[in-house]
Amino acid sequence: NFVGIYGWTTNPLIEYYVAEMGSMTGGTYVNSVDSDGHSYSFYKSYRYNAPSIIGTANFWQYKDTWGSAPTGSNQTVTMSNHINNWSNWGGQGFGSYNYQILALEAWGGRSGSINATVWQQ
């Protein structure tokens, strides 16, 4: 399962995750980035003929994960820290935003819910 930030860029086409809960490993480990009191591991992989926001396509997938579950309220995700790291170390730049959401994703027969308020600082 996954709770965190999910989004896409175009030019280049990149699908990205910042996992605040759940493990999103897989792909090649690139480096780590410190943000909001956590050390996130950055993994990237290349997806071939996979579903995307423009239909079936080839694209990069970036995943930052720290593997623990935050508790309480007012958790912060400073996206600029992740984007700067991806831009510097991803090898493709970062592209133009298409969309970005706070997401809960469940698989393997699991389900879940979240009560959240999203705000911009």
Model-derived features with residue positions:
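Beta-sandwich interaction modules
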Residues: 46-94
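Surface-exposed beta-strand edges and flanking loops
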Residues: 7, 20, 44, 64, ...
